[in-house]
């Protein structure tokens, strides 16, 4: 399987090698209905974003703020995950002369108070980078992040509804903060009806709110509800990072369960003081991860839903002081 990582992108708003810029109080759309000959699910459909932010030839792009934006009806390519493609998507691209400019990266990023509705593929993504080769392995040191990754990233008070794929994701960031966000009914296009011509692409997976290759990411006071069924489809996913903490979050009726600890490079992760209400399929997915701590959570569980999702186990975890309550006692 392959990922598409180059091609044409249509962006309603584009910040290219910008610094100390605030985009605020706009309504933004980028639909595909007027493009002759382009079908919704075609494999080579143009990528589209509401707001694209790109770092390339100016080194560290600092001080990007996206605040109080209403972004809707962005009809991107449902298959492509590694390009600017969705409601808000920030990427670092390979510089023309890295020795002269320094690595392309972001620092001091704030995405706050935005409403994203019917956007595809991603809802809100911060930080995909050309420099991913510097983040291999499970244990991650600070040094690669300080040179190639992203610093001081905050994603707060955003609402993502009906994203075609993933809801909210932060990538390649050192100690990012993701708080008070909602992912509602995301992954609504990761199904056989819409995701119908992927070719040899990987990626028929999507989840609610999660990090990729971050160190010490903190997710708190978020809500993920009604994530639609696919190979993942859980509310939260500690994916291939070091030291992710989920605390004081709420999840409800996500069709793939509450939380996944994803694969061999997901280490030192903690899931504590969260509430899961009627998550489906299986409450947790410890998917070949070396370790995880699941402590002091409350799980309201429907009859017949297992704690570990079938065919999503094989990993290691420690469960301490969790409360399990049968859902039938709390529904009319």
Residue ranges, per PLM feature:
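Extracytoplasmic loops and strand-loop junctions of Gram-negative outer membrane beta-barrel proteins
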Residues: 7, 203-204
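Structural detector of coil-to-beta-strand junctions
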Residues: 12, 34-35, 48-52, 77-78, ...
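Extracellular beta-strand-rich solenoid/capping regions of secreted or surface-exposed proteins
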Residues: 1-22, 32-62, 80-98, 102-103
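Short, intrinsically disordered, charge-balanced linker/junction segments flanking boundaries
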Residues: 1-2, 328-332
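Right-handed parallel beta-helix
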Residues: 19-30, 59-75, 98-122, 134-166, ...
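Extracellular beta-strand solenoids
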Residues: 15, 28, 53, 90, ...
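Active-site-proximal loop/turn and secondary-structure-junction residues that shape catalytic pockets
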Residues: 94, 128-130, 174
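Residue-level marker of regulatory loop/turn positions in helix-turn-helix DNA-binding domains and
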Residues: 15, 43, 58, 80, ...
